[in-house]
C-alpha cells in the first residue's frame, strides 16, 4: 500500500492508523466522494434559492487537494494519457523479460517460459555462474 506524504508522517504511530477512515484497509469510502460533497453550499448573499449549478456544488477553491485530484483523474483526457503511459510501461517490462530470457540456457532453447520461471531460472543461473567463478 502506498502512503501519501501526509499518511507517511502519521504512520509511525500505530494508534493513528485506525483514527483516519481513509487509512483503514478495505474499500476507501471517499474514492467516489461522499454525500456531503454533493450537498448545496450556502450562498453568502441572496435567499439561497438561486437554482444555479454553482450553488449546488462546492466552488473549486473549497475542494480539498484530494478531491481536486480525484476530479482531475476522472476526466477522459487523463484516463487516456494514463492508459498510454501504462501501455508503454508494460511493453518496456515485457521487452526486458524477453532480453533476459535470451540470456538463459534452456532445453529446448525456444521453450516458452512464464515471467516467474524466467526470474527463477535467472537466479539459479547467476548463482551457478557465481559458483563457477569462486572455484
Curated annotation (Swiss-Prot):
Q: What is its main location?
A: nucleus
- Tell me the keywords, alphabetical order: Activator, Developmental protein, Differentiation, DNA-binding, Hypogonadotropic hypogonadism, Nucleus, Transcription, Transcription regulation
Report domain bHLH positions: 77-129
The subcellular localization recorded is: Nucleus
Q: Quote any Pfam family the record assigns.
A: HLH
Q: Which domain of life is it from?
A: Eukaryota
Q: Which residues form a coiled coil?
A: none
The record's region (Disordered) falls at 1-80
Ranges of Basic residues composition bias in the record: 68-80
Which portions of the chain have biased composition (kind: Basic and acidic residues)? 10-21
Per the UniProt entry, what are the Gene Ontology biological process annotations, in alphabetical order?
A: apoptotic process; cell migration in hindbrain; central nervous system development; hypothalamus gonadotrophin-releasing hormone neuron development; male gonad development; male mating behavior; ovulation cycle; peripheral nervous system development
State its role: Transcription factor which binds the E box motif 5'-CA[TC][AG]TG-3'. Involved in regulating energy expenditure, body mass, voluntary physical activity, mating behavior and reproductive longevity, acting through the hypothalamic-pituitary-gonadal axis. Acts as a transcriptional activator of target genes, including NDN, PCSK1, MC4R. Is also a transcriptional activator of KISS1. May act centrally to regulate function of both white and brown adipose tissue.
Q: PANTHER family attached here?
A: HELIX-LOOP-HELIX PROTEIN 2, T-CELL ACUTE LYMPHOCYTIC LEUKEMIA/STEM CELL LEUKEMIA-RELATED
Pathological condition linked to this protein in its record: Hypogonadotropic hypogonadism 27 without anosmia: A form of hypogonadotropic hypogonadism, a group of disorders characterized by absent or incomplete sexual maturation by the age of 18 years, in conjunction with low levels of circulating gonadotropins and testosterone, and no other abnormalities of the hypothalamic-pituitary axis. In some cases, it is associated with non-reproductive phenotypes, such as anosmia, cleft palate, and sensorineural hearing loss. Anosmia or hyposmia is related to the absence or hypoplasia of the olfactory bulbs and tracts.
The entry's protein name is: Helix-loop-helix protein 2
Amino acid at each position: 500500500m502506498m502512503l501519501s506524504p501526509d499518511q507517511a508522517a502519521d504512520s509511525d504511530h500505530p494508534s493513528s492508523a485506525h483514527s483516519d477512515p481513509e487509512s483503514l484497509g478495505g474499500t476507501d469510502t471517499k474514492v467516489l466522494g461522499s454525500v456531503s460533497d454533493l450537498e448545496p453550499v450556502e450562498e453568502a448573499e441572496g435567499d439561497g434559492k438561486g437554482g444555479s449549478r454553482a450553488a449546488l456544488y462546492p466552488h473549486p477553491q473549497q475542494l480539498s487537494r484530494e478531491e481536486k485530484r480525484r476530479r482531475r483523474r476522472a476526466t477522459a483526457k487523463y484516463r487516456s494519457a494514463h492508459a498510454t503511459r501504462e501501455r508503454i510501461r508494460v511493453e518496456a517490462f515485457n521487452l526486458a523479460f524477453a532480453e533476459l530470457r535470451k540470456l538463459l540456457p534452456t532445453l529446448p532453447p525456444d521453450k516458452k517460459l512464464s515471467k516467474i520461471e524466467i526470474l527463477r531460472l535467472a537466479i539459479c543461473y547467476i548463482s551457478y555462474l557465481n559458483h563457477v567463478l569462486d572455484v
